[in-house]
């Protein structure tokens, strides 16, 4: 019945929203988490693992489990994924009670694997339950739930902590909400919903992709940054291994009979260009979500709530840019908006890269007529720029992929963005820590040798602030360059007149006999 499929897709969208929220929710509560698991403030780089391992699990699981649902059924895979999400949430919350950092990482990884399956399965479910001519709005709504999570996640985390006074409750709340989604799915979907001709799962391709990303992340992480080496001793061999795995992945996808994405009808130049631009946008997004708050705490000496409040300007501008970008793209085309949006974002990050230690007093003079706060203005510019490209990149990707593969193509855009987040935050964190120790060593040498103990302590504190400011300045400069590179790729995405080659196929029957397409 129509009511049943609406309940099912609502439950799937709720699950997608929860997974997206938990991708970003930790960004604004990192200080509380650090205190609970015993990470000192001078080891900020360790806490990034709660983000990177979630993203790694998410990216590794998405293509494999999405395809697995074709073989084993949407209902079964959704229920298994939701159960895994509950387990991961419980482990993460308990890690806070026990103060166990490794348990925390394990919980976040389980969460990532589970939530990575939710988006492609729910997209496929929408394609099953709605006929082709009516499914665009349904798939768009599911995608909107994913995007909404990226906007609300940081605010959701700080709100729950403000309301309940404990960061663990962010994860405990997942248990009843996910259980509700499981009950809705149980009663709204038939038990036997496997495809009559199930597709084979590209297990080799998925494992090669996960291996490449995992080796890259571990190779980039230096647990003991000393300002002399960017990478740990084992870093270079692991990065070489990641490169080999990546080459093997692309080689496999080129010649294998079963692939993550069927190349038939796909226009690969604009498709890969859109994914590349999504990687750049994802890297910039995650660097902002992580490093702006750390700048507030490490340089401006803000508390957690104040530092999270800095992000509010960026997070408000992001959806405004997304809505505006979608509206403009229908008139000017996706290519122009993607190019302009990433250039605007690059300009915003160039402004952010010049943030001084006394940022709160810094202002921009606008044509000599009036002044505006530099911090707020720069974050709004970056947020608007990144927001502008969300719709055009997704639209351009889907336009050059046959409609039968729109679900996996939508997931590919998310995978590309999260790959950018994962590799971007790992690589820039490694570079930042390397440069921080170099900068700090140079600044410390400027302390007069005859300074008193109090003067020396004050000078050291000021030097740490200055070193943090310079380090983040370099990180955001690189982020601006990444956005410029993404803008160039934006020029190569599909125009409005370029479309995929649609194969001649008949409309497939719906998932269950009792469901009638509109």
Swiss-Prot record:
Changing residue 22 to E: Decreases resistance to ethidium bromide, tested in M.smegmatis. Disruption phenotype: Disruption of only this gene, or of the lrpG-Rv1410c operon leads to increased levels of many triacylglyceride alkylforms; up to 100-fold increase depending on the exact form. Cells grow more slowly on lipid carbon sources, conditions thought to mimic infection, and grow more slowly in infected mice. Disruption of the preceeding gene lprG leads to loss of expression of Rv1410c due to polar effects; in infected BALB/c mice 1.5 and 2.5 log decrease in bacterial load 15 and 35 days after infection. This is Triacylglyceride transporter Rv1410c. Resistance to ethidium bromide is inhibited by reserpine. Belongs to the major facilitator superfamily. P55 (TC 2.A.1.3.34) family. It comes from Mycobacterium tuberculosis (strain ATCC 25618 / H37Rv). PROSITE patterns: MFS (PS50850). Changing residue 289 to D: Still complements for vancomycin resistance in M.smegmatis. Changing residue 70 to N: No longer complements for antibiotic resistance in M.smegmatis.
């Amino acid at each position: 019945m129509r009511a049943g499929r609406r309940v099912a897709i609502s439950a799937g969208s709720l699950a997608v929203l929860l997974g997206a929220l938990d991708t970003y929710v930790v960004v604004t509560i990192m200080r509380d988490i650090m205190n609970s698991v015993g990470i000192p403030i001078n080891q900020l780089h360790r806490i990034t693992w709660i983000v990177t391992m979630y993203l790694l699990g998410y990216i590794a699981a998405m293509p494999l489990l999405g395809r697995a649902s074709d073989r084993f059924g949407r209902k079964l895979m959704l229920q298994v994924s939701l159960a895994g999400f509950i387990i991961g949430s419980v482990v993460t919350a308990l890690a806070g009670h026990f103060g166990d950092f490794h348990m925390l990482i394990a919980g976040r990884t389980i969460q990532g694997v589970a939530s990575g399956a939710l988006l492609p399965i729910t997209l496929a479910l929408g394609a099953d339950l709605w006929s082709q001519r009516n499914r665009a709005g349904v798939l768009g709504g599911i995608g909107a739930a994913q995007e909404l999570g990226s906007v609300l996640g940081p605010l959701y985390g700080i709100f729950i902590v403000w309301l309940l006074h404990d960061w663990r409750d962010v994860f405990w709340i997942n248990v009843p909400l996910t259980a509700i989604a499981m009950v809705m799915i149980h009663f709204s979907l038939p038990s036997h919903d496997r495809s009559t001709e199930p597709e084979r799962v590209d297990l080799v391709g998925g494992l090669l992709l996960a291996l490449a990303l995992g080796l890259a992340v571990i190779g980039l992480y230096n647990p003991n940054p000393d300002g002399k080496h960017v990478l740990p001793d084992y870093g270079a061999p692991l990065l070489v291994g990641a490169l080999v795995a990546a080459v093997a992945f692309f080689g496999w996808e080129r010649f294998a009979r079963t692939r993550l994405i069927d190349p038939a009808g796909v226009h690969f130049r604009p498709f890969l260009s859109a994914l590349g631009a999504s990687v750049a946008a994802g890297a910039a997004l995650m660097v902002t979500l992580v490093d702006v708050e750390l700048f507030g705490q490490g340089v401006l000496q803000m508390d957690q709530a104040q530092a999270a409040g800095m992000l509010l300007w960026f997070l408000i501008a992001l959806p405004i840019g997304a809505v505006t970008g979608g509206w403009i793209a229908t008139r000017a085309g996706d290519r122009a908006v993607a190019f302009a949006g990433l250039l605007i974002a690059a300009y915003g990050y160039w402004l952010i890269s010049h943030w001084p230690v006394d940022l709160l007093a810094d202002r921009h003079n606008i044509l000599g007529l009036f002044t505006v706060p530099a911090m707020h203005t720069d974050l709004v510019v970056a947020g608007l720029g990144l927001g502008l490209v969300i719709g055009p990149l997704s639209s351009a990707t889907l336009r050059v992929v046959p409609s039968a593969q729109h679900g996996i193509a939508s997931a590919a855009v998310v995978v590309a963005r999260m790959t950018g987040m994962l590799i971007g935050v790992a690589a820039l964190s490694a570079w930042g820590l390397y440069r921080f120790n170099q900068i700090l060593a140079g600044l410390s040498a400027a302390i007069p040798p005859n300074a008193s103990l109090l003067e020396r302590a004050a000078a050291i504190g000021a030097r740490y602030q200055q070193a943090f400011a310079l380090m983040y300045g370099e990180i955001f400069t690189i982020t601006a360059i990444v956005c410029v590179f993404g803008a160039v790729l934006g020029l190569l995405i599909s125009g409005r007149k370029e479309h995929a080659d649609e194969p001649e196929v008949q409309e497939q029957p719906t998932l269950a006999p009792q469901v009638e397409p509109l």
